[in-house]
């Protein structure tokens, strides 16, 4: 398990609400909570930037974090991330914020402390461009959308 530096920015974390933790030994994501001042109604089509009350510092340029939606919120209520996925670079040290978008047809109440997203650490490979006149031939070539089959 990799050590991750974290700062609690909202004193309710660790007291009223638990620190992010893996739910099972096979869990990939840590749940992030809505550390709002009060319950908030998210209307259909509305987007809201929600504080998590937590900042992290990954430090290792070989790692990054992704903020991903919780599957149940999207499937059952139409609550997804406004930016679809959040990328946290290894040198970022500010508060983790979650952009929530209600793509559903009914208003959704976000309760204080509700689990709204999940944080997943991922490996990073940085690349540099090697400019070429032509690519080595491949089986796929430049075939794009739908090229590898109809379904």
Curated annotation (Swiss-Prot):
Its EC number is 3.6.1.23. The keyword Metal-binding applies. Pfam families: dUTPase (PF00692). Pathway: Pyrimidine metabolism; dUMP biosynthesis; dUMP from dCTP (dUTP route): step 2/2. InterPro entries: dUTPase, dUTPase-like, dUTPase-like_sf, dUTPase_trimeric. Substrate binds at residues 70-72, 83, 87-89, 97. It is an enzyme of class 3 (hydrolase). GO terms for molecular function: dUTP diphosphatase activity; magnesium ion binding. The keyword Hydrolase applies. It catalyses: dUTP + H2O = dUMP + diphosphate + H(+). One of its GO terms (biological process) is dUMP biosynthetic process. Gene3D superfamilies: 2.70.40.10. Keywords: Hydrolase, Magnesium, Metal-binding, Nucleotide metabolism. Its cofactor is Mg(2+). This enzyme is involved in nucleotide metabolism: it produces dUMP, the immediate precursor of thymidine nucleotides and it decreases the intracellular concentration of dUTP so that uracil cannot be incorporated into DNA. Belongs to the dUTPase family. NCBIfam families: dut (TIGR00576), PRK00601.1 (NF001862). This is Deoxyuridine 5'-triphosphate nucleotidohydrolase.
């Amino acid at each position: 398990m990799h050590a991750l530096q974290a700062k609690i920015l909202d004193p309710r974390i660790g007291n009223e609400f638990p620190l992010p933790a893996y739910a099972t030994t096979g869990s990939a994501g840590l749940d992030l909570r809505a550390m709002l001042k009060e319950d908030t109604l998210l209307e259909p089509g509305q987007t809201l930037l929600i504080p998590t009350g937590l900042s992290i510092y990954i430090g290792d340029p070989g790692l990054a974090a992704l903020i991903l939606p919780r599957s149940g919120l999207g499937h059952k209520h139409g609550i997804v991330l406004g930016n679809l996925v959040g990328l946290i670079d290894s040198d970022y040290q500010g508060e983790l914020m979650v952009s929530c978008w209600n793509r559903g047809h009914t208003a959704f109440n976000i309760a204080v402390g509700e689990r709204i997203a999940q944080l997943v650490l991922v490996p990073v490979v940085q690349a540099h461009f090697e400019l070429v006149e032509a690519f080595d031939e491949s089986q796929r070539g430049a075939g794009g959308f739908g090229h590898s089959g109809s379904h």
